[in-house]
Amino acid sequence: MKPILLQGHERSITQIKYNREGDLLFTVAKDPIVNVWYSVNGERLGTYMGHTGAVWCVDADWDTKHVLTGSADNSCRLWDCETGKQLALLKTNSAVRTCGFDFGGSIIMFSTDKQMGYQCFVSFFDLRDPSQIDNNEPYMKIPCNDSKITSAVWGPLGECIIAGHESGELNQYSAKSGEVLVNVKEHSRQINDIQLSRDMTMFVTASKDNTAKLFDSTTLEHQKTFRTERPVNSAALSPNYDHVVLGGGQEAMDVTTTSTRIGKFEARFFHLAFEEEFGRVKGHFGLINSVAFHPDGKSYSSGGEDGYVRIHYFDPQYFEFEFEA
């Protein structure tokens, strides 16, 4: 399984994301550059230039017309995917940590950090109403008083958002009223990543408490746990098989205070039902910050602390693999 190596960032990768069809791969890092690549051969299509700080999150809408990015330069920006033109600039008081389009692509949400005396907020904008964008006035703003949101995704049918917090809590917020619909706390430390399954019925969380967990996306009922020895930064569900891939590792600054060695975190594959690890893929130098499955399930990508993105196409053996319980 020889990976395709994508070199387009000078700093560590923060998030990678495929569009719905999977022909494009968007990558963002702790530099101001947003890159888009052809996922089939790793050719760089272009960059979205405009941010002036680290970019924390990226999302593409249903038909890949628009791209949304959130950055530490205290802004969330909307781009034309094809031309790279900046369509909207939404200023915030603190860094934008998560962002996303709803199912129809007409409503965007993003969350800001709790920093410099400012509160953590989730803001909702309707792109069909230009006045909201022009006046930078969201139709709804949800304050998060306790612990800041570290990862958030839209729930099924765009009725709610599922947010993971620094404290390990999971909340489901209504996209209409802003109230908390469900609240659970299954993780003991920060939730780094949330990714939905293809049919949006379940999602996987990756946490600093060395586990990834599977939840029902409507009830937030905890289903499965995947345990590792190091903090998990990202987890993704296969669209075809009952497989989940985990990426993570020990942060360099934590290495001396713990008994684990630096790096030493390959991409790890677990069986979804049996919670058993069945494979590992080496490659990155240092930890893995983001993983994503291609929507056809035939390849996956990982972005690391080393600033590289690797696209791995699975060998035929992967598709013939039968898990014996």
From Swiss-Prot:
Q: Which residues carry this modification: N6-acetyllysine?
A: 264
Name where it mostly resides: cytoplasm
Q: Start-end of the WD repeats?
A: 8-47, 50-91, 144-183, 186-225, 283-324
Q: Where in the cell is it found?
A: Cytoplasm
Q: Which organism is it from?
A: Pongo abelii (Sumatran orangutan)
Please, which domain of life does this record's source organism belong to?
Eukaryota
Q: Does the keyword DNA repair apply?
A: no
Citing just one GO molecular function, the answer is:
RNA binding
GO annotation, cellular component aspect: eukaryotic 43S preinitiation complex; eukaryotic 48S preinitiation complex; eukaryotic translation initiation factor 3 complex; eukaryotic translation initiation factor 3 complex, eIF3m
Q: Which residues carry this modification: Phosphotyrosine?
A: 308
Family classification: Belongs to the eIF-3 subunit I family.
Q: Reply yes or no: does the keyword Ubl conjugation apply.
A: yes
Protein name per its UniProtKB record: Eukaryotic translation initiation factor 3 subunit I
Residue positions, PTM Phosphothreonine: 219
The record describes the protein's role as:
Component of the eukaryotic translation initiation factor 3 (eIF-3) complex, which is required for several steps in the initiation of protein synthesis. The eIF-3 complex associates with the 40S ribosome and facilitates the recruitment of eIF-1, eIF-1A, eIF-2:GTP:methionyl-tRNAi and eIF-5 to form the 43S pre-initiation complex (43S PIC). The eIF-3 complex stimulates mRNA recruitment to the 43S PIC and scanning of the mRNA for AUG recognition.
Kindly give the InterPro entries that the UniProt entry links to this protein.
eIF3i, WD40/YVTN_repeat-like_dom_sf, WD40_repeat_CS, WD40_repeat_dom_sf, WD40_rpt
PTM characteristics: Phosphorylated by TGF-beta type II receptor.
